[in-house]
UniProtKB/Swiss-Prot annotation:
It comes from the Bacteria. One of its GO terms (biological process) is bacterial-type flagellum-dependent cell motility. This is Flagellar L-ring protein. Keywords: Bacterial flagellum, Cell outer membrane, Lipoprotein, Membrane, Palmitate, Signal.
Length: 234
């Protein structure tokens, strides 16, 4: 019976804990977009010259159309530091008294009986003293480095020379899967001669690097430990 009561108390306490925000789902692999190329009718069917291969000798192979491939060089280095210090001190004292009450040196309700011994001018009716001190320090440091190269597809061409690109790469080694996804906006002028662009030149960039497998499972906290963290009040 005692164990049943303890279990009921634990369940009731777990219901009172604040609900944690559900983690955002991990981004999956981006499916390839459907690209339809309209058929162009030749103006002169009997001619040996074709506009489709007119620029093969001097063509620019940098990505600029929907469905083209562009290399994204992911080089992300970020470091943030924050430090705060607070110190406060407050001290106050005070005394309140009555020197005379209707020309009497003693204060009392019944004649001959006093509430205070001695003269009221010598003994204060109220005396207080207060001291408050506070000191707090906080410091945080975070550093992140991601380096990778991934091929992305142009999924949309926007006005102003912008291209929306999306790409993903999945690598599986010994039952451990590493997934890299990238998406964002790239200017056609930022694409280098080798058809590559730096991730630092992307706008609205979203880069994810995560894994699935035995190693990732070992790095997670167990469900019972997370439950006790929610129930433990201290």
């Amino acid at each position: 019976m005692r164990y049943a009561v303890i279990c009921m108390l634990l369940l009731a306490a777990s219901g009172c804990t604040a609900a944690r925000q559900a983690p955002s789902p991990e981004p999956g692999l981006v499916p390839p977009p459907v690209v339809t190329t309209p058929e162009e009718k030749a103006e002169n069917p009997g001619s040996l010259f074709s506009d489709e291969n007119a620029d093969l000798l001097y063509a620019d192979y940098r990505a600029r159309r929907v469905g083209d491939i562009v290399l994204i060089n992911i080089v992300e280095n970020s470091k943030a530091e924050n430090k705060a210090s607070t110190s406060t001190n407050k001290e106050s004292t005070g005394e309140y008294g009555v020197s005379s009450f209707f020309d009497r040196s003693k204060v009392g309700i019944i004649p001959g009986q006093t509430l205070l011994s001695g003269r009221t001018g010598d003994v204060p009716l109220l005396k207080f003293s207060s001291v408050s001190d506070f000191s707090g320090d906080g410091e945080t440091t975070r550093e992140n480095t991601v380096t990778a190269t991934i091929a992305a597809r142009v999924t949309r061409v926007l006005p102003g020379g912008l291209m929306q690109v999306e790409g993903s790469r999945e690598t599986r080694v010994n039952e451990e899967t590493q997934i890299v996804t990238v998406s964002g906006l790239v200017r056609t002028s930022d694409v280098a001669d080798d058809n590559s662009v730096m991730s630092t030149q992307m706008a609205d960039a979203r880069i994810s690097y995560y894994g699935k497998g035995v190693i990732s499972d070992k790095q997670r906290v167990g469900w019972f430990t997370r439950l006790m963290d929610n129930l433990w009040p201290f």
